Regions:
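Acceptor/aglycone-binding surface of glycosyltransferases and processive sugar-polymer synthases
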Residues: 4-20, 37-119, 145-155, 160
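Short aromatic/hydrophobic "clamp" motif used to bind/position activated sugar donors
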Residues: 26
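Terminal low-complexity segments of carbohydrate-biosynthetic enzymes
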Residues: 48-49, 105-106, 159-187
Length: 187
């Protein structure tokens, strides 16, 4: 068990856990198990096929959503996905599904670079993974909406948008360059 020094955000907690992980494959999942843990085998299979990172997706096969989000949350998710595409060039159907697996060496390469400590950490780690040439595979998984989420789309949505801009700024300013992430002129 890894303890955190207070509540510093989900991104901080995931980074802390991944940097302490010992297995060959490191997995994180939402605490509410929106994707059943049995779905982890799909992510492991993707890694065994050659992916460095396997990310669960709610949107590649929507029929796997056993309980859908309210429409306002779906709309927020689509808008955020479009913003990621424009600002960071990410082309994934779903970066925010809290079900991701990493080869340990891939996790050890990108999580030390992570700067975002709140909800916007997912696009940052995928942005970094792409920039250092890691292979990311998106995998459709079973998923059910949970009312217990702590994410508030309107309040946290603005913060997440600002975090996307911060990731772009960090890249342009060369904040990731020391760790081998391509320089801004190559972005």
């Amino acid at each position: 068990l890894v303890a955190n020094p207070g509540n510093r955000g989900i991104g901080f907690s995931v980074r802390n856990g991944m940097l302490h992980a010992r297995g060959d494959i490191c997995l994180f999942t939402d605490a509410d198990l929106s994707s059943p843990i049995t779905e982890a085998q799909k992510l492991f299979d993707a890694i065994n096929r050659g992916a460095d990172i396997a990310i669960g997706s709610r949107w590649l096969r929507t029929e796997l959503q056993t309980e859908r989000q309210p429409l306002y949350r779906q709309a927020f998710g689509r808008i955020f996905n479009l913003a990621q595409r424009i600002i960071l060039g990410l082309r994934f159907a779903d970066t925010q599904c809290g079900f991701k697996a990493f080869r340990r060496d891939a996790a050890q390469r990108i999580f030390p670079l992570q700067k975002i400590e709140r909800w916007g950490f997912d696009p940052e780690i995928l942005f970094l993974a792409r920039r250092v040439g890691l292979r990311v595979e998106e995998v459709p998984v079973l998923w059910a909406h949970s009312e217990g989420t702590r994410l508030h789309p309107f309040r946290d949505g603005l913060r997440m948008f600002v975090e996307l801009l911060r990731i772009r700024w960090n890249a342009m300013a060369g904040d990731y360059a020391a760790a081998g992430v391509p320089s801004p002129e190559k972005l």
